[in-house]
């Protein structure tokens, strides 16, 4: 049965895996992999794992930058979709997206698990919206202004790749992230990794609770 299959959680680095597993404990229906940084590595490593056995679905979990006034440091973001804004071509008239070129799409769809997000919202501010997957993290005012126009709530680097891998196996995909810093001019003195990793641990705890209920992940999502 579908609800007996494991769910794959993909994180980019070992520190995220450790925080997530602290919250999950021993959970037989969940598997966690480190898929690497950037959406190329994330796509390849997630697809490699998905090829080994059947899964119920895939969730990309990690830290992210939040756009000011949309997702504050310490909050959680849930993707309604993922956009990779750099895929396309330059021209004298401006950027041309891969969609406009006719070679693919810069957008991947994501599901929001209502039971999981509902439980998380009891103890966290949870924001829903577009999460960007970028090749180069924003670090200047110029880049911030360009990306802010896209209306996203957060910026990360792996969601597009993990989503593409899940799609190739016809599996549902979600992306959940905790906000460690504001998107904008790079200033590590204002980042809060401990709070973000604490949030990842709490996401793990909540996933464990959901899986132990009669309800299971991906049985109630949109």
PLM features per residue range, with description:
Residues 18, 22-222:
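Glycine-rich phosphate- or other oxyanion-binding loops that anchor nucleotides, phosphorylated ligands
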Residues 1-2, 222:
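Basic/polar N-terminal segments that are highly enriched at the extreme N-terminus
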Residues 12-16:
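Short polar catalytic/cofactor-binding loops
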Residues 2-8, 30:
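Extreme N-terminal starter segment of soluble prokaryotic enzymes
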């Amino acid at each position: 049965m579908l609800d007996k299959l494991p769910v794959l959680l993909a994180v980019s680095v070992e520190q995220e895996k450790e925080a997530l597993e602290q919250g999950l404990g021993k959970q037989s229906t969940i598997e966690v992999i480190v898929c690497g940084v950037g959406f190329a590595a994330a796509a390849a490593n997630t697809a490699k794992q998905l090829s080994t056995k059947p899964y119920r679905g895939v969730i990309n979990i990690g830290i992210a930058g939040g756009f000011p006034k949309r997702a504050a440091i310490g909050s959680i973001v849930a993707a309604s979709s993922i956009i990779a804004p750099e895929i396309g071509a330059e021209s004298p008239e401006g950027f041309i997206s891969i969609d406009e070129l006719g070679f693919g799409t810069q957008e991947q769809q994501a599901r929001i698990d209502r039971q999981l997000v509902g439980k998380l919202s009891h103890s966290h501010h949870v924001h829903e919206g577009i999460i960007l997957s970028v090749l180069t993290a924003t670090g200047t005012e110029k880049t911030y202004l360009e990306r802010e126009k896209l209306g996203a709530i957060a910026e990360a680097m792996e969601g597009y790749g993990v989503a593409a891998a899940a799609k190739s196996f016809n599996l549902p995909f979600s992306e959940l992230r905790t906000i460690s810093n504001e998107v904008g001019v790079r200033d590590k003195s204002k980042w809060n990794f401990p709070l973000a990793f604490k949030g990842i641990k709490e996401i793990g705890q909540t996933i464990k609770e959901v899986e132990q209920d009669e309800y299971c992940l991906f049985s109630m999502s949109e």
